[in-house]
Amino acid sequence: MEKLVIRGGKPLSGTVSVSGSKNSALAIMAAALLPASGKTVIHRVPNLRDVHTLSNLLRIIGAKVDFEAHTLSIASGDISHYEAPYELVKKMRASIYVLGPLLGRFGRAKVSLPGGCAFGPRPVDLHIESMKKLGADIKLEDGYIIAKTKRKGLSGAKIDFRISSVGATGNTLMAAALAKGTTCLTNAALEPEIVYLCEFLEKMGAKISGIGTTTLEIEGVDELYPIRADNICDRIEAGTLLAAAAITHGNITLTDVDPDHLTAILEKFKEIGCEVSTTETAITLSAPETLLPSNVEALPYPKFPTDMQAQWIALMTQANGISQIIDQVYTERFNHVPELNRLGGEITVKNNMATVHGVKPLSGAKVMSTDLRASASLILAGLAAKGTTEVLRVYHLDRGYESIEKKLRKLGARIRRQTYDEFAQPQLT
């Protein structure tokens, strides 16, 4: 097992590059199953556990996958299996993305119900309902989604998502791209990763209108073609690094980033007193000595993202006043709060709202990661804490942050990765 050891109290400064988006990469990797021949090549793919998990899943169903130096190539002409097994899907919820491409191209799929971060219910019913509306027969059996189409394959349909869902929107887009007729999606997700998936599919030959709006119209085509493409930036990694600068009262510049993807996040940094400037591909943040409190409501894009909620709670422990953070997307996503309180935070949770009382001096301690973004929040707190903080079980972190400790060290953080024996007996003194 590995942990991160952090000696806090040092302001961050310098320049660092932002990695390619994990969430975008996973979606377009699944889309690479749609062409019947050739090789799709994707640049700027982050070297993450989730990327390797999906790569292995694609290999199991027969795709040829090569990953080297942040470039991923996928040849899907020889797919011979249509099952995504539990052993892989349990590791990552995004594995369900193969459902739409397999159904759209082959008319059949067997996908284990997914795993991933454990913070409350995140049902897959929207995915299943959409596939049924496109004409698939679906049953749940022995922990699997078993889906088949009629002889004619999928057919276009009108689908109104009752809640905005990135995963369901992406999966339905990929299935509808090869369906017969026209599919209309309403209340579709607006996230940059969905916009980029639409553009990626269009480049493959799909016909999609309404890109960047909540209403998407997909005219099915007979065939899609392999392409070469560059992945977009990871806006959540960017937001996390900016929060690291703010919580340490530092000054950093991020490069290879699209500020337009972080509009709501940047507005909140300005609200707490940070100076923020941008170019087309860079963001500079300078934090004040005294941070102001800020209330946040996590909502679907373009509002403040739920994937920054945990980091914002950590940051608000160092703001001068009371902040309230409401999560309207994942209402039970507060596993990080008890661990932040172990470091000295004063945070209470009621229903889907956390109330943070700052400024609270933080002190180093051992804390336990419970999920991906919780891990990031504990690192931020450790950077601000007096003394040494040990963040255990950082395998959660490795699902979504590429060498985050190296990037933080480049900015001056005193942070290192160590191995430890989780079951070792403590030494009594």
From Swiss-Prot:
Cellular compartments annotated: Cytoplasm
Q: Tell me which residues bear 2-(S-cysteinyl)pyruvic acid O-phosphothioketal.
A: C117
Kindly give the Gene3D superfamilies that the UniProt entry links to this protein.
Enolpyruvate transferase domain
Give any Gene Ontology cellular component: cytoplasm
Keywords of the record: Cell cycle, Cell division, Cell shape, Cell wall biogenesis/degradation, Cytoplasm, Peptidoglycan synthesis, Pyruvate, Transferase
Quickly give the catalysed reaction.
Answer: phosphoenolpyruvate + UDP-N-acetyl-alpha-D-glucosamine = UDP-N-acetyl-3-O-(1-carboxyvinyl)-alpha-D-glucosamine + phosphate
Tell me a Gene Ontology molecular-function term this record carries: UDP-N-acetylglucosamine 1-carboxyvinyltransferase activity
Q: Per the UniProt entry, what are the Gene Ontology biological process annotations, in alphabetical order?
A: cell division; cell wall organization; peptidoglycan biosynthetic process; regulation of cell shape; UDP-N-acetylgalactosamine biosynthetic process
InterPro entries in alphabetical order = Enolpyruvate_Tfrase_dom, Enolpyruvate_Tfrase_sf, MurA_subfamily, RNA3'P_cycl/enolpyr_Trfase_a/b, UDP_GlcNAc_COvinyl_MurA
Which Pfam family, just one, is annotated for this protein?
A: EPSP_synthase
General function of this protein: Cell wall formation. Adds enolpyruvyl to UDP-N-acetylglucosamine.
Stated name of the protein? UDP-N-acetylglucosamine 1-carboxyvinyltransferase
Can you name the source organism?
Answer: Chloroherpeton thalassium (strain ATCC 35110 / GB-78)
Q: Which gene encodes it?
A: murA
